Amino acid sequence: MRPILVSYLLTVSFAAIASPAPMDSTAEFRAAGSLAMQGDMKSALSHLTRVQLKELKDDRQRSVATCMRERFVEKKAPPIAADIDPWAGRVLSAYRRYWTRTMLGTQAATAGERELAATLALMVTLPQGAGPAPGLDVLEPLLIAKLEARGYHALFGITAPLREFMLWRKQTDETYDIDLPEGREPVHVAMMDDFVSLGWLGYAICDYHHTGGWATPERLFAVRSAYDLDSESFKVSYLAHEGQHFADYRRFPGLAQPDLEYRAKLVEISKARTSLFDLLDAFDADGADSRETPHPWADRQVIKNLSEKLLKGEKPSAAMLKRFSVEQLNAAAVELLAEDTRQRAPKATKT
């Protein structure tokens, strides 16, 4: 099975991690979260262990910091809930071990995937010709079939940089007509509820931060509990973001995930109004330079390219961009998306 491209919809933002000055506990917590969302728990713990819980003013942050320490410092995995099917629980336990070892750097990613595949291969009936060591792309359809027979829905594939496993029990279908900068996009959205696993990102940060949805060539998927369905966040950071993926899958087949995310985040900036400055702050805080982490890379590119267009040589930053009006920022994002489309359109025509 070709791994499914998953899009993060970030439910919180973490502050930038680079700081030459000593950080207080809130800043240390945010730095830990920023690194954890990139799958680098080893570096995250260097900040998390300096957090003084009593200095955190947010009860939720204290709870999350305690949970992360239990999982990744004390190595105490949370118990599988008693109402979970035992076989599904074994699959989840295998993924949790893989996520933990890979994020902590105690096992290389490739070795972790091989060990995960070997564990899962013992839990399914392999087809003829699968070979003695089938990979995860072979195993995932078999796992999905077995989970569905037990009343679950599942997502596998890759949420860079790790293999993914999300598991939920309820799903209903909705239809939306999404207004994008380059045209309207009618799409189907599967609303998901009653989650058992919110994926590696949710596991890393104790569900303080997790995937809120994704797109496939057929339809969109939304974690219902992540959104107020009447809010701008849902309409912009989910529907518009993921709707752009849907359009780009069709228009630019094979477009790399970092570029898909860049285009979708430009659409967010083009449509956001009340949430626009918060989006700029989030993109600025969470940005990174490596295309190996597509969302942070796209965050940085959006801030960088908006700054080049509007600031005329000044240092890129959300603070500087917020000197411009909502309308100016919306228009600049539309222009950047159009420029990106023009660069890609001839290539798409030739394929």
PLM features: what roles do these ranges have?
Residues 96-99, 256-291:
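Post-HExxH zinc-binding segment in Zn-dependent metallohydrolases
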Residues 273-351:
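Long, well-structured alpha-helical subdomains associated
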Residues 6-16:
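Bacterial N-terminal signal peptides
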Residues 1-4:
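Positively charged n-region of N-terminal signal peptides that target proteins for export
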Residues 19-153:
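N-terminal low-structure segments adjacent to metalloprotease catalytic domains
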Residues 161-231:
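Active-site scaffold of zinc-dependent metalloenzymes
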Residues 236-250:
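Active-site recognition of the HExxH zinc-binding catalytic motif
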Residues 218, 232-233, 249-266:
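Post-HEXXH active-site segment of zinc metalloproteases
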